[in-house]
């Protein structure tokens, strides 16, 4: 891992350097880090750069060090994807990170039950409610799991908690769990503008769709294959990995689509950029999505997106301007076909998607989260100095931070 860049000097000496503890089921180095990992990585990199200290407690995975330190960042890895929750609670209760100023609890369908045991000021980050995810992955068993692990804890324990989420749709879903909307803040995900940008010369010569993300059942990638099957002469780049890959490989053979799909598996950041630039349309058909990070990343490369109209995707895509939304697979296939067949429409959507992506930056996202964390800290400690990084910054908003600088090894 490379050394971290030195912290930026605050424009005011009257500011505090915080120690932020993150509780998450996985960190950004995990092979299944996904959008959660990207979000945490981007924000943590900036908090460190602004002079703060960050500790993360997350699950372990094969080959991961139990403790990893770089500069003011410490990653603690305990338990597996299921056992990380009791392990993290027990280890933190015993004082693993005794001096945190504020806690960011990341809830990906399972809570850490922090209202029962955590006395440090805290904020709960929920990307999206996972009920549909549970049902899609586990059927009837998933309904019971969602009730026990997500629905009941949120309704019974978290009513007085402060929440952060990434779209209005997710905010509404959280509020439906009995949380006062006034306690829910929204901060859209950003884009690394220095890492993504258009290159018309890199566009594929033949009509090309791109799906980029984890290969999970709830992502409903079979619907992407439906769209492909209804549009002859189109190629699909399928980038990412996950436990649904074998089923998708079998589906390709069963449908006779193998020759029209390039299965890439995990891809590097460099390859991700190439795929975004090659694609004519970026497509996602997930059953649960808080925002749609691939939508804004593709947009930064002037590639329009297509999706089913649900969750945060209906906010990430401005239908008819930066991409297309549909209410069912048949309509999605028809709209995608129209975009692929009309170069003027496709170029107009791509230009608008690029302009829209420029409205989002990780600096803004990281600062908004830090504001909320600091507000909870100062509410518990009246008179405390504000956190460094909340005053006007001296560097360009949206500047990219090298992923290796915070130990990132995560492909898509």
Across the structure, where does each feature detected by a protein language model lie?
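Conserved donor-binding/catalytic core segment of Leloir-type glycosyltransferases
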Residues: 164, 200-231, 237
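Carbohydrate-associated surface elements
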Residues: 169, 190
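Nucleotide-activated donor-binding/catalytic signature segment of Leloir-type glycosyltransferases, i.e.
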Residues: 249-267
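Short alpha-helical donor nucleotide-sugar binding micro-motif in glycosyltransferases
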Residues: 266-267, 274-279
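Aromatic "clamp/platform" in nucleotide-sugar-dependent glycosyltransferases that forms part
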Residues: 287
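Short hydrophobic beta-strand element within catalytic cores of glycosyltransferases
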Residues: 295, 304-307, 317
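Conserved acidic donor-binding segment of nucleotide-sugar-dependent glycosyltransferases
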Residues: 319-330, 338-344
């Amino acid at each position: 891992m490379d050394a971290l860049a030195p912290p930026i000097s605050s424009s005011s000496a009257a500011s505090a350097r915080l120690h932020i503890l993150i509780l998450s089921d996985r960190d950004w180095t995990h092979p299944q880090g996904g959008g959660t990992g990207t979000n945490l990585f981007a924000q943590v990199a900036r908090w460190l750069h602004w002079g703060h200290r960050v500790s993360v407690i997350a699950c372990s995975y094969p080959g991961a060090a139990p403790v990893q330190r770089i500069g003011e960042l410490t990653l603690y890895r305990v338990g597996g994807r299921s056992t990380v929750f009791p392990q993290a609670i027990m280890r933190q209760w015993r004082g693993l990170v005794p001096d945190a100023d504020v806690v960011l609890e990341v809830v990906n369908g399972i809570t850490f039950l922090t209202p029962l045991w955590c006395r440090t000021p805290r904020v709960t980050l929920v990307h999206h409610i996972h009920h549909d995810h549970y049902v899609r992955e586990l059927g009837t068993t998933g309904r019971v799991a969602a009730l026990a692990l997500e629905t009941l804890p949120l309704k019974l324990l978290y009513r007085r908690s402060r929440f952060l989420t990434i779209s209005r749709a997710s905010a509404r879903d959280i509020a439906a769990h009995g949380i006062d909307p006034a306690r829910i803040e929204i901060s859209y995900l950003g884009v690394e503008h220095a890492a993504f940008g258009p290159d018309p010369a890199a566009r594929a010569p033949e009509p090309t769709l791109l799906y980029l993300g984890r290969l999970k059942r709830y992502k409903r990638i079979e619907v992407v294959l439906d769209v492909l099957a209804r549009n002859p002469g189109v190629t699909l780049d399928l980038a990412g990995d996950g436990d649904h890959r074998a089923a998708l490989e079998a589906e390709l053979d069963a449908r006779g689509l193998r020759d029209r799909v390039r299965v890439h598996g995990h891809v590097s950041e460099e390859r991700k950029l190439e795929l975004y630039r090659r694609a004519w349309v970026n497509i996602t058909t997930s059953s649960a999505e808080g925002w749609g990070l691939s939508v804004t990343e593709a947009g930064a490369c002037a590639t329009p997106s297509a999706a089913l109209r649900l969750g945060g995707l209906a906010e990430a895509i401005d239908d008819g301007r930066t991409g297309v939304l549909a209410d069912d697979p048949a309509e999605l296939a028809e709209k995608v076909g129209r975009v692929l067949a009309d170069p003027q429409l496709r170029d107009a959507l791509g230009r608008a998607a690029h302009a829209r992506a420029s409205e989002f930056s990780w600096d803004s996202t990281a600062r908004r989260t830090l504001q909320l964390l600091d507000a909870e800290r100062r509410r518990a400690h009246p008179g405390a100095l504000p956190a460094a990084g909340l005053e006007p910054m001296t560097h360009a908003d949206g500047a990219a931070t090298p992923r290796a600088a915070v130990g990132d090894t995560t492909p898509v």
